[in-house]
Amino acid sequence: MSSKVPPIILNNGVEMPQLGFGVWQVPDDEAERAVATALEAGYRSIDTAAIYGNEEGTGKAIAASGLPREDIFVTTKLWNSDQGYDSTLRAFDTSLEKLGLDYVDLYLIHWPLPSRDRYVDTYKAFEKLLADGRVRAIGVSNFLPEHLRRLLAETSVVPAVNQIELHPHLQQHEAREIHAEQGIATEAWSPLGQGKGLLEVPAIVAIAQKHNRTPAQIVLRWHLQLGNIVIPKSVTPSRIKENIEVFDFSLDVEDLAAISALNEDRRLGPDPATFDMA
């Protein structure tokens, strides 16, 4: 693991870097370049998904990096149309082949799709992949507390991670509470709120000026000090480097309080209770 990024110890003892590189909305050929840049900058965790269409480019960059496989933490996700026990196992094989890997470090159910009611069977297939040593940890993404409670009641393995939309405008207090109770790591997607106004908020700009940092670095540091795992995405080399330079300063109590006061429970992405796109 990179010495620059400290690890989070997941509930099964596996170490996951607290900051990783996301490739959502990055075309395959561009993903290869971006992941190569990220690995050179010191990132050792890469977050992709079947639906992103860039598992191949991600895998090529990992192979070309020359880094030992065990030094890179790879996450991918099962897409909604593949939910169900047997179809999950087939979809995993496809993802693994595209990535060119023998195993993935973390496999996530991308969305719960409660209206289709397949996430429990899907997760049971995840448990088989874990038992067979094909994944090192299993988890979920975009699961609301009610979905987590059902999963905990009907399956055997507590999810290692729940990756959810989380940023200063959507702080997810209830989700983080159940995660803490159950030993589930909280991972933030869109940790910078997709930049939509968040990085111009006066409170964040003022804290950035105080620390001589960028607003993005301030928001990432806020996440890290809360204990969240973060996966900022960028295809701009300077931003990729900027986003990992957040381990040599700290926010004080007043800074953290000022950012925590910005919560509006405002989602930028879909509502997991109703989202059912396959």
Regions flagged by a language model, labelled:
Residues R69-D82, L106-P112, L166:
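A short, structured active-site edge motif that brings together acidic residues
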Residues S2-I8, E56-A63, A91-T94, P145-L148, ...:
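Alpha-helical scaffolding within the catalytic cores
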Residues V26-D29, A49-G57, S81-D86, P114-D117, ...:
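Acidic-and-aromatic substrate-binding clefts and catalytic sites of carbohydrate-active enzymes
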Residues P112-A278:
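Beta/alpha (TIM)-barrel catalytic core signal, keyed to glycine-rich beta->alpha loops juxtaposed to Asp/Glu
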Residues N11, T88-I109, K128-D132, E154, ...:
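CE4/NodB-like, metal-dependent polysaccharide N-deacetylase domain
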Residues P27-L39, G84-L99, E146-R149, L170-Q171:
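Short, acidic/polar
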Residues M1-I72, A278:
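N-terminal binding-site loop/beta-alpha segment at the start of enzyme catalytic domains
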Residues S45, Y103-L106, A137, V161:
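Residues at the N-termini of beta-strands
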